[in-house]
Amino acid sequence: MPLLTTEELSQMSPLFRGRGGQWLAGKLMQLVRVDELNALYDRNAMHRGADFATAVLDDRQIDYLLGNAEMLDKLPQGPFITISNHPCGHIDGIMLIEIFARIRPGFKVMVNKILGRVKAMEDNFITVIPTGRKRDVPQKESLLGVKAAISQVRSGEPVGFFPSGAVSDLSLRDRCVRDREWQEALIKLIRKLHVPIIPVRFFDGNSRLYYLLGLLFGSGIRLLRLPAEVLDKREKPLRLGIGPVIDLEAQDACTDLESYAKMLRDSVYGMPLPETFLSRGELLGR
């Protein structure tokens, strides 16, 4: 079952309807390499969860290096939360699931509706539609996602969040690639859940072209580049690190939401590049 079909594109826009529209839809899917993503999915759809994540990474020869891997031996026994920056997009969630769901099979990551189409990983996904603005009314699917996250934690299972709700972009002001402001609604949810938090930082990102497209044309055009970014990550290993657990005492020391949000973001972006890493092969062989 493909992730996206030309028929579904025709439902999104009249531009892709009729014989000519379907031809155009097919060409667009080739241009942005959605057809390659469909083929990647079909080759590995017999796997589920963490096994699917592993199969996809193996298929594309995508490697990563995990810093502070010893923290995986100190994971809380009950529910916990992971928080992460989001520099690469879909591949960030896939790596998180391979790492954490192999230890805690019930681990789920809150993802957007696009990644939520990957049915082979639906057991490890909570699907939402990020609003991105404080005053936007959450859609029904997002409200269901919030309820699912609460239920996940109350049942004693871990859940992962990308608090930005969007892939990182290039900030000319800060002269670096960074997440936009983390969503207030998610910060409130994390605080309400009141369980240990594990920061995870991804130290690498997408291509220069990806960020340039975002600067010149906005997030819509940049989104079309994401399939290629997923498919072209084999050149060098991606680096990520796990930080110290943020316990309940540290969380309770924050007297307001602003200081709480700052503590969470600082726990990720303040994480230094680890001095030593464990290769993906070594991690899976543990």
Predicted regions and their residues:
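Short amphipathic alpha-helical face segments that pack within enzyme cores
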Residues: 91, 95-98, 185-188
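Structural motif
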Residues: 81-83, 126-127, 160-162
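A conditional alpha-helix N-cap/helix-loop micro-motif detector
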Residues: 46, 62-63, 138-143, 179-180
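Conserved nucleotide-cofactor-binding alpha/beta core module
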Residues: 101, 106-142, 146-147
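Non-catalytic C-terminal accessory region of glycerolipid acyltransferases
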Residues: 2-6, 142-286
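Membrane-anchoring hydrophobic helices of lipid-metabolizing enzymes
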Residues: 1-83, 93-95, 102-106, 122-123, ...
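Gly/Ser/Thr-rich loops at beta-strand to alpha-helix junctions
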Residues: 86-90, 167-168
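Glycine-rich, phosphate-binding/catalytic loops in enzymes
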Residues: 98-101, 177-179
